[in-house]
Amino acid sequence: MPSLLITVLFLNVIIYVINTVGAATVDGLLWLLYIKLPTGTSQIAREQRHMKREVVQLKHEMSSTSSQDEFAKWAKLRRRHDKAMEAYEAKNNELTQSKSTFDMTIKIARWAATSGLMLFLQFWYSKTPIFTLPPGWIPWQVQWVLSFPRAPMGTVSIQIWGGACATVVALVGDAMRASLAYVSKPKIDRIKLGATMEGKEGKKRQ
């Protein structure tokens, strides 16, 4: 079943990417995209940013105004600042509650679309072979392991295929990360060396 074979491989790649990047990072990016959409939450986010700018501006004006020489003006700014701060905190709490609900929804959806789907496929297709091995190619003991737990003898079960995919994806991913780190390291060393040489030349000129 090629479609099931590819689906399991694709799911393992997605799970590895999420675990490598970090679920919190993925959730943060999705939140930034969500508040750009024309929704009620995006309206709350825009109002929160506007109120924050207003609070900062009023605080700056208060700092620039003398409470002794211009007390009337300073007191008026203080009242406006306190009122704006109260409105900002209320709006910020509303946005925080919306984000908490969004984070919980995303966590459930992410689990259902990755690990949850993988568990469902392993249960539903536990008797379905991913592919069939050539007759007599390997000993029956190994065939039994590869067909574990419920696939026909002489085939590879979805559980074994999923474990193999997870292992290979992790090995390939780690190898790619190590290669990128090795390639980028000489560039960083050259930048540091160039900065050191420029510093020494500057000292000699002085």
Curated annotation (Swiss-Prot):
Residues 75-100 form a coiled coil. The keyword Lipid metabolism does not apply. It is a multi-pass membrane protein. One of its GO terms (biological process) is tail-anchored membrane protein insertion into ER membrane. Residues 25-110, 173-206 are cytoplasmic. Keywords: Coiled coil, Endoplasmic reticulum, Membrane, Transmembrane, Transmembrane helix, Transport. Required for the post-translational delivery of tail-anchored (TA) proteins to the endoplasmic reticulum. Acts as a membrane receptor for soluble GET3, which recognizes and selectively binds the transmembrane domain of TA proteins in the cytosol. HAMAP family: Get1 (MF_03113). Interacts with GET3. This is Protein GET1. It comes from Ajellomyces capsulatus (strain NAm1 / WU24) (Darling's disease fungus). The gene is GET1.
